[in-house]
Structure formats: C-alpha cells, structure tokens
Curated annotation (Swiss-Prot):
Matches recorded under PROSITE patterns: RBFA
Organism listed in the record: Nocardia farcinica (strain IFM 10152)
Annotated HAMAP family: RbfA
Region of interest called Disordered, as start-end residue ranges on this chain: 127-147
Alphabetical keyword list: Cytoplasm, Ribosome biogenesis
Gene Ontology MF: a single term: ribosomal small subunit binding
Keyword Repeat belongs to the record: no
Quaternary structure and interacting proteins, as annotated: Monomer. Binds 30S ribosomal subunits, but not 50S ribosomal subunits or 70S ribosomes.
UniProt cross-references to InterPro entries, sorted A to Z: KH_dom-like_a/b, RbfA, RbfA_dom_sf, Ribosome-bd_factorA_CS
Record keyword Cytoplasm present: yes
Protein name: Ribosome-binding factor A
Family: Belongs to the RbfA family.
Gene giving rise to this polypeptide: rbfA
Length: 147
C-alpha cells in the first residue's frame, strides 16, 4: 500500500497531464468540449480513474457524451504515454475514463432550490396580505363581564 498523500499528488498530476494533452496535443474534434474534473488512483498506483464532463457547443445544445467517450477511448494510449512521461513513476497507471455526473446533479439541485425559493416567496407574499379571522382580541376579560 502506498502513502495516501502520494496517491493524491499523483492523481492531481495525472488530471493535469491529461487535461493539457487533450487541450493542446490530441487533435480529435470529439474532445473539443471535454473537461477533466478529477482523477483517482488505486492504492497500488496501477490504475487511474479520470473523471470528465462534456459541454455542448452552445449553452442550449445537448452535449454529445457518446462521441466524447469514443474519442477518449481512442486517445487512451496516447494519453497514457503522456502520463508515463510526465509522472516518472515506475509503472504507468492504466487509465479509465468515467463521465462525471456531479455538474449535472448540481444543476438539477440549483433548479430545485430556485423553485423552492419561488414557492417561499409566494407563501411570504400571501402571509403578508393575510388577516386574522375573528376579533382582534378573542379572549374575554373581566372588563367585558362588568359591562
């Protein structure tokens, strides 16, 4: 088993190398909108999982996840050789690419929070306009009995 700090440093370095290689060296058009978000390395430093997200060409366009996965699978050998040259470890870890679902989940969570805020604002508006039912002072006092 290897030191956890070393594994974290190696994972960070792998994500930097892969991101740089995708941006500047790999000329596959399917990888234009791929962003490397994280990497994790196993305890024996033999396998690395690289997490990525894919953006659409425009804000409203749906990302092409399948094309990005195919492009990463095709470039896996080149990226592994870049990782080997850039890290200097005895055994270059094999790379596995996994689509990162965190940004999509965060976007959905933001939409839910926005809907909840709108509902809270509506409830506050209705509550501000509300009036009490009945008399302002519904409790009987001794003064009322004397009259």
């Amino acid at each position: 088993m290897v030191d956890q700090a070393r594994a974290r440093r190696l994972a960070k370095r792998i994500s930097e190398i892969v991101a740089t290689a995708i941006e500047y060296e790999v000329k596959d058009p399917r990888l234009r909108f791929v962003t490397i978000t994280d990497a994790k390395v196993t305890g024996d430093l033999r396998e690395a999982t690289v997490y990525y997200t894919v953006m659409g060409e425009t804000i409203d366009a749906e990302p092409d996840y399948d094309a990005a996965a195919a492009g990463l699978a095709k470039a896996k050998g080149v990226l592994r050789s870049k990782v080997g040259a850039g890290t200097g470890v005895k055994f270059t870890p094999s790379l596995a690419f996994v689509l990162d679902k965190v940004p999509d989940a965060a976007r959905e969570m933001e939409e839910l929070l926005a809907r909840a805020r709108a509902a809270d604002a509506e409830v506050a508006r209705v509550a501000a306009e509300a009036r009490h039912a009945g008399e302002p002072d519904p409790y009987k006092t001794d003064r009322d009995d004397a009259e």
